[in-house]
A protein has these predicted regions:
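Compositionally biased, proline/threonine/alanine/serine-rich low-complexity intrinsically disordered stretches
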Residues: 384-431
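Short, surface-exposed polybasic-and-hydrophobic patches located at secondary-structure transitions
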Residues: 119-130, 153-171, 386-395
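Flexible beta-edge/linker motif
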Residues: 57-117, 128-145, 265-267
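Flexible, surface-exposed loop regions and adjacent strand-edge segments
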Residues: 116-123, 290-296
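N-terminal "mature head" segments of proteins
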Residues: 35-49, 63, 103, 135-142, ...
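N-terminal type II signal-anchor transmembrane helix
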Residues: 1-47, 402-411
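A short, amphipathic edge element
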Residues: 47-54, 307
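Small-residue helix/turn framework positions
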Residues: 64-65, 69-72, 101-111, 166-391
């Protein structure tokens, strides 16, 4: 027999064997209706909540494929998957240990408050890791996936993840479709090490760096990383995630991040970041400090231009959403300067600081509070009078003599020092 004929015969025999195997598998598999019922029961056991599946379909040819349509959890804010398509490796079905070559998720909604319920369920929080170094899922693709934050802010993402063993991403990319300037986050693994190069494009700038994962006793994972934000327009960056920023301007700095947990969900929930930043120049949006002072707080709508803005931003994911804490804030607008601190959480801002009308002047304490979209500024009455006098005197004397007549709560504040300031009336008292 010729060599070519032998190869042809060999391929034919192999094809026949594979066909017989697939027929055997088909014999084991249920009807679509039975299949949907089995998947529903399995999902409810793993997730710990009731679920519904609109329809389910499986096919062995031309390749093993499973399609789910209209998956929903029975929750106040349901988790929804419009369509999930899973492509299986045919050879792995024979061992009853299926491996997914690719899973595609389209038109999904993941409310953060609903997903958190699954973290306490072992079946959802601890996916099967397979045998040894086996890979149970090679690639995950998602399109039009909406993540809904604790505060109800919906953000749509597209992305892909290629997995190595133990669910380690080999390559991952996350995008915000239709956003300009674009947002992309890319992770690339360094060989087999639990270390990844991170490249982020957002707000017209970049934040490149690296992240690493370490395993500790008891199965706890520790995530750490460093990023270098460069030229990121703050308002544009937050607008990319359907959020409003209190300031605008291009920011640069250094960021460190960390998280601890036993699963990806726990790592995300515990994520902490610290960024030392500078924005030069910057603009405070929706608050005109000059107007607030000159009108004794009756008017404050507008903006405040700053020659520079520096400080430290700490973020912490909590059960009630992300908390952002600004400390060591220093801003300069011409001869005037401001120091202070602020906390932003659940759409509310609470800030306090000291306004210096001229170099060396006594500071006028102020507070800013309320919704981020429309905060209110407040200055103690005596300081209002001082601020108005100083504002009139500055063009003439070139100094802040008038401001020194102010009486801040607890005594005058000299130089650049800070002290806590309580909310004050918005009208000046008569002496």
């Amino acid at each position: 027999m010729k060599r070519g004929q032998k190869w042809t015969l060999g391929v034919g025999i192999a094809g026949a064997v594979l066909g017989a195997a697939l027929l055997a598998v088909a014999w084991w598999l249920p009807t679509d209706k039975e299949f949907a019922a089995r998947l529903t029961a399995e999902a409810e056991e793993r997730l710990g909540v009731r679920v519904t599946i609109g329809s389910a379909h499986w096919a062995l040819l031309p390749r093993p494929t499973v399609v789910l349509n209209d998956f929903r959890t029975r929750q106040t804010q349901p988790v929804v998957i419009g369509q999930l398509t899973a492509h299986l490796k045919a050879r792995t079905l024979l061992d009853r240990k299926p491996v997914f070559g690719r899973i595609e998720i389209n038109d999904a909604v993941f409310p953060r408050n609903s997903v958190r319920v699954f973290q306490g369920t072992a079946g959802a929080s601890k996916p099967d890791t397979g045998d040894g170094d086996s890979v149970l899922l090679e690639r995950l693709e998602f399109r039009n996936l909406t993540w809904v934050s604790h505060g109800g802010i919906a953000v749509i993402y597209d992305g892909e993840i290629d997995f190595d063993a133990h669910w380690r991403p080999r390559h991952a990319e996350l995008r915000r479709p239709g956003i300009s300037p674009p947002f992309t986050l890319t992770l690339k693994r360094d060989g087999d090490a639990d270390r990844w190069q991170a490249r982020i494009h957002v707000g017209g700038g970049t934040a490149h760096g690296n992240v690493a994962l370490k395993s500790a006793a008891g199965g706890t994972l520790h995530l750490s990383g460093r990023l270098t934000p460069i030229g990121i327009e703050v308002a544009s960056a937050l607008r990319s995630f359907n959020r409003r920023s209190p300031v605008s301007g291009k920011s640069s700095g250094k960021t460190v991040l960390s998280a601890d947990g036993k699963s990806a969900g726990e790592l995300a929930e515990s994520l902490r970041t610290r960024t030392v930043f500078s924005v030069n120049p910057a603009t405070i949006l929706r608050v005109d400090l000059e107007k607030a002072i000159s009108t004794l707080g009756k008017e404050h709508d507008g903006q405040t231009a700053l020659q520079e803005l520096t400080g430290q931003l700490d973020t912490q994911n909590t059960d009630n959403g992300m908390r952002a804490i600004y400390t060591g804030l220093k801003a300069r607008a011409g001869k005037r300067s401001v120091t202070g601190e602020a906390t932003v959480h659940r759409g509310q801002v609470e800030a306090s600081g000291i306004l210096f009308l001229a170099e060396g002047a006594i500071g006028a304490p102020f507070t800013v509070s309320g919704p981020v979209s429309k905060p209110k500024a407040s200055v103690p009455p005596a300081s209002y009078a001082a601020a108005v006098i100083s504002a009139a005197a500055l063009p003439v004397t070139g100094s802040g003599i008038g401001a020194r007549t102010g009486d801040a709560p607890g005594g005058p504040v000299e130089g650049g020092g800070q002290q806590p300031v309580a909310a004050a009336p918005v009208t000046a008292k008569e002496n």
